[in-house]
């Protein structure tokens, strides 16, 4: 799976909204939407924050692990 697919899956499972994530991580809503649609990928720093906030590993989001 690609990052956008994993990211969308984790968002759905977490029940968190794009706006909520954007506010919590000081990102724009457009930025979060770009991650969801695959337009862009997060920086390493943002990936770390996303993983911490969503309680998921970077390996999982990047498709390197199924856990």
Give the role of each language-model region.
Residues 26-41:
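Recognition helix of helix-turn-helix/homeodomain-like DNA-binding domains
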Residues 7, 21-22, 32-35, 61:
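Conserved hydrophobic/aromatic packing and binding residues within compact polymer-binding modules
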Residues 1-16:
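A short, Lys/Arg-rich alpha-helix, primarily the initiator
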Residues 12, 23, 52:
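Alpha-helical residues within the helix-turn-helix
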Residues 26, 45-60:
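DNA major-groove recognition helix of helix-turn-helix/homeodomain DNA-binding modules
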Residues 11, 36, 54, 62-65:
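DNA major-groove recognition helix of helix-turn-helix
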Residues 6, 17, 43-46, 57:
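Residues that mark the N-terminal boundary/hinge immediately upstream of a DNA-recognition element
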């Amino acid at each position: 799976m690609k990052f956008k697919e994993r990211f969308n899956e984790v968002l759905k499972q977490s029940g968190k909204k794009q706006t909520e994530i954007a506010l919590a991580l000081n990102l724009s809503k457009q930025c979060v939407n770009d991650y969801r649609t695959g337009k862009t990928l997060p920086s390493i720093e943002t990936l770390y924050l996303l993983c911490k906030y969503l309680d998921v590993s970077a390996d999982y989001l990047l498709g390197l692990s199924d856990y």
